[in-house]
Regions:
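Hydrophobic faces of well-ordered beta-strands that scaffold small-molecule active sites
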Residues: 176, 214-217, 238
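Catalytic cores of alpha/beta
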Residues: 222-233
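Glycine-rich phosphate-binding active-site loops on the catalytic face of alpha/beta enzymes
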Residues: 234-245
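Alpha/beta enzyme core
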Residues: 162-177, 210, 228-229
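Alpha-helix-loop-beta-strand connector modules within alpha/beta enzyme cores
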Residues: 191-210
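Glycine-rich, proline-tolerant flexible connector loops at the mouths of alpha/beta enzymes
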Residues: 178-190
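Extended, highly charged accessory segments
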Residues: 1-161, 166, 170
C-alpha cells in the first residue's frame, strides 16, 4: 500500500512467461521485428524508414503508449550524429542520485556507462550503500469488465506512486526504482510512460526534481524506441525486464 516493491524471482511469480509478455503489451511483432534480431545480431533490424503501420489510435492492437509516439515520416540529421567518431563530445554516461548544486554537497552519485542496465548492474545498484535506493511498484488493481472503475483505479495509483516518489525525494533523495516485475492476474502494469511523466511533473511542481533519479525496471521495454520514450519523459536509466526474460526460458517456453 505504500508503493514499495519487494523482489522475488520470476519463477516464483503467478504468471508464466507467455502471460507476462501479453500483460506487457507484446505480441509476435515484438519478437519477430524487435527482440529476435537484436538477440541474434546485437543490433536492431534494418527496415524501411518511417512507421508504415496504422496509427495507434486506429489500431485494434493497442501495443502500449510508446506506439503513440512513433513517427510517420523519416527524419535524419545533417551532419549525422556519430557517437564513435565524435566520442570526445558525446557520451552515454549517466549520473544517478541527487544532483549537486551550488553551496550544497548532499552526497555522492553513481556513474554508469550507459542508461541500459544489465542484470549484474541492477543487482549492484540495489546492493550498494553510497546512494539511497527506494522501490516503487508500478501495478494497479485492474477491472477488465468495468472501464470507469478501471480508469479510476489506474489514475489513483499513478497519483499515489507520484506522491510517494516525491515524498522520498523530499525526505531522503537518491534513486527511485520503478518496477512492474511483479505483475499478476489481478494487478496489471501501469503504463510506463504515463507514470514516468506524472512523477517527473510532480517532482518539478514540488521543487525536488534534482534530488532523485528514476530507474525504470519494466517489461514494457522491448526496443530502442521504448527506451527513448522512457528517457525522454524523465527516466535516467532502464532495466528491460522482458528482453532479459526472453533470453532465459527454454525453447519450449518461448
Amino acid at each position: 500500500s505504500d508503493g514499495r516493491f519487494y523482489r522475488v524471482s520470476v519463477d516464483q511469480a503467478e504468471l508464466g512467461y507467455a502471460a507476462r509478455y501479453v500483460g506487457y503489451a507484446h505480441n509476435q511483432e515484438t519478437f519477430k521485428f524487435l527482440m529476435d534480431p537484436m538477440l541474434q545480431n546485437g543490433a536492431e533490424k534494418v527496415s524501411a524508414m518511417g512507421y508504415g503501420n496504422a496509427i495507434n489510435a486506429l489500431s485494434d492492437a493497442e501495443g502500449g503508449i510508446a506506439k503513440y509516439f512513433s513517427q510517420r515520416f523519416a527524419q535524419v540529421t545533417n551532419p549525422p550524429l556519430d557517437s564513435l567518431r565524435e566520442s570526445d563530445g558525446m557520451t552515454l554516461r549517466v549520473c544517478l542520485g541527487e544532483k549537486p548544486y551550488l553551496g550544497k554537497n548532499r552526497g555522492k552519485q553513481i556513474v554508469i556507462d550507459t542508461p541500459i542496465l544489465t542484470s549484474v548492474e541492477m543487482s549492484t545498484l540495489q546492493g550498494q550503500k553510497l546512494v539511497a535506493v527506494e522501490h516503487f511498484c508500478l501495478l494497479y488493481h485492474a477491472f477488465s469488465e468495468d472501464t470507469e472503475r478501471n480508469e479510476e483505479s489506474l489514475t489513483a495509483k499513478i497519483d499515489e506512486v507520484a506522491t510517494a516518489v516525491s515524498k522520498f525525494a523530499e525526505e531522503r533523495g537518491g534513486i527511485a526504482v520503478l518496477s512492474d516485475r511483479l505483475m499478476d492476474s489481478t494487478n496489471a502494469c501501469l503504463p510506463m510512460i504515463l507514470v514516468i511523466s506524472a512523477i517527473n511533473q510532480k517532482l518539478i511542481e514540488t521543487g525536488v526534481r534534482l534530488k532523485v533519479s528514476l530507474v525504470v525496471e519494466s517489461g514494457q521495454i522491448a526496443s530502442s524506441h521504448h527506451i527513448a520514450c522512457a528517457l525522454g519523459f524523465g527516466a535516467s536509466a532502464v532495466y528491460p525486464v522482458a528482453c532479459l526474460l526472453y533470453t532465459s526460458p527454454s525453447p519450449r517456453d518461448r
